[in-house]
């Protein structure tokens, strides 16, 4: 059981999706839930079916007091590394909220330095904290939709299937077709593909 910090009225949960993929942005979400408007079935986005995630994402957007997305693009990831880019994207999500929270709960073990709001990192927060679960669902749905859009542009890479993660199929496509502008140049398999072409 997670114990919420005491004395804070508006608490935001923050999570990121897309640290592991070789392509595209790392996407984050920040969510302030409404205690008078509970959402059933919130869980870590990775443990939910796509259908369930999509339904919950709509419900979160409808019922949350505030929600926002943040992102760091592939070129930013290459410039400052994936961890720093994830933290930057988290800060962007929090700053984009229409209501500023009094406290922020962040999935993982790191807190962005420039948040300027009291915060706590929660390991396995996406399973323990409803606000972080909600954020993980919004971020995952948003990023998956981006991969589906990329798939329409470059169907030969099968992005809708692997969502940019370094699966056997994605690595085969990289070796065969080379890297796209959206690929993260600092990631080893992409570097290798760039050297071959």
Swiss-Prot record:
UniProt GO BP: DNA replication, removal of RNA primer; mismatch repair
A Pfam match: RNase_HII
EC number(s) per entry: 3.1.26.4
Reported cofactor(s): Mn(2+); Mg(2+)
Reactions listed under catalytic activity: Endonucleolytic cleavage to 5'-phosphomonoester
RNase H type-2 domain boundaries: 9-197
InterPro entries found in the cross-reference section: RNase_HII, RNase_HII/HIII, RNase_HII/HIII_dom, RNaseH-like_sf, RNaseH_sf
Enzyme class: hydrolase
Keywords, comma-separated and alphabetical: Cytoplasm, Endonuclease, Hydrolase, Manganese, Metal-binding, Nuclease
Main subcellular location: cytoplasm
Gene Ontology MF term list: manganese ion binding; RNA binding; RNA-DNA hybrid ribonuclease activity
Protein location: Cytoplasm
Gene Ontology, cellular component aspect: cytoplasm; ribonuclease H2 complex
Statement: the UniProt record of this protein carries the keyword Iron: no
Cofactor: binding comment: Manganese or magnesium. Binds 1 divalent metal ion per monomer in the absence of substrate. May bind a second metal ion after substrate binding.
Chain positions recorded as a divalent metal cation binding sites: 15-16, 107
Free-text function comment from the UniProt entry: Endonuclease that specifically degrades the RNA of RNA-DNA hybrids.
Family of this protein: Belongs to the RNase HII family.
Record-given protein name: Ribonuclease HII
Species in which this protein is naturally found: Haemophilus influenzae (strain ATCC 51907 / DSM 11121 / KW20 / Rd)
């Amino acid at each position: 059981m997670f114990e919420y910090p005491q004395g804070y009225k508006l608490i935001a949960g923050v999570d990121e999706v897309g640290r592991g993929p070789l392509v595209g942005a790392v996407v984050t979400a920040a969510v302030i839930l409404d205690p008078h408007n509970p959402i059933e079935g919130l869980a870590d986005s990775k443990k939910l079916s796509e259908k369930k995630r999509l339904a919950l994402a709509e419900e979160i957007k409808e019922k949350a007091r505030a929600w926002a997305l943040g992102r760091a693009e592939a070129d930013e990831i290459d410039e400052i590394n994936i961890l720093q880019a994830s933290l930057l994207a988290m800060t962007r999500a929090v700053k984009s909220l229409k209501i500023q929270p009094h406290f922020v709960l962040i999935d993982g073990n790191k807190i962005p330095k420039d948040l300027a709001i009291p915060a706590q990192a929660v390991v396995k927060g996406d399973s323990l904290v409803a606000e972080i679960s909600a954020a993980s669902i919004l971020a995952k749905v948003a990023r998956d939709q981006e991969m589906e859009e990329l798939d329409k542009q470059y169907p030969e890479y099968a992005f809708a299937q692997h969502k940019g993660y370094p699966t056997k199929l994605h690595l085969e496509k990289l070796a065969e077709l080379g890297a796209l502008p959206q690929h993260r140049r600092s990631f080893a398999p992409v570097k290798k593909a760039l050297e071959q072409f």
